[in-house]
Amino acid sequence: MQAITVLNPDELGQDPAVGMDLALALGVRHLEIRTAYGSNALVLDDEQVRRVRQLADERGLRVAALASPLWKWCSPEATPGRVDSFGFPTQVHAGDRERWVERAITVAGLLGTERVRVFSHLSVGEQTESLRDDPLLPYALKAAERAGVQLLLENEPVCTIAEPASLLDVLQAHPGLGLWLDLGNLFEVGQGTVEAVEALAPYTEYVHIKDYRPRDDGMKDFVAAGTGAVPYRELLPALHRARPGLPYALETHVRATPGEALTLGAEFLRATVPGGLA
């Protein structure tokens, strides 16, 4: 089964048409939507979301996933650290969260995708909340199932669940939940191994690809996939063997030359995933 390549148009800016045109030029037929027109996708009004879908349809592109910010939040009483939430608040009242879940499911429907990303609460010391025991999660999973959507948990280091053991714990506790596996994040927490990938593969429904070179000051220099420290040449074949046919989404974070990074990343993926990518 051949895997697919996914491109996020907002890597090239807030006019989604620009990124979609690059996708076409690269032979990429699937999109991930996170932000557009200066707003998080969940904050866009229905007409703006429909416009994104129309632009994709006009080019023969399909939205593979909605990269929502659900659960990348904490309570208003907590103080989050520096977090990139892509235009969405990091402090959300408990009473508002159900509405955001419903909005994400609605946006996914408007975009025509069945995959919606979620996180696991920001880590904020003693005020950190638990996703595994969050009563909102069973509600969200049932609402998603009714809508024909699957919620996929990303392993995010600034959130509570980033390592294989904790990922497996919550995925097994909530069978409707899938995994949005970020291999760069897995490497960041010291778990970028073939063994970890093989353990997580049965739950994986979507894959994020980004690469970087660690700096002496603890920061990262993001680079095109295949040119950094993440051991993709070992991880990608192992994941494909265990779980063929997955979507692989390029998330470069390369600010200066995003088009070049996406082009090189797409070439690398096609050369490294056995059988190539569509």
What are these regions (language model features)?
Residues 33-56, 121-124:
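Glycine-rich, proline-tolerant flexible connector loops at the mouths of alpha/beta enzymes
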Residues 36, 71, 121, 212, ...:
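Flexible loop residues that form catalytic
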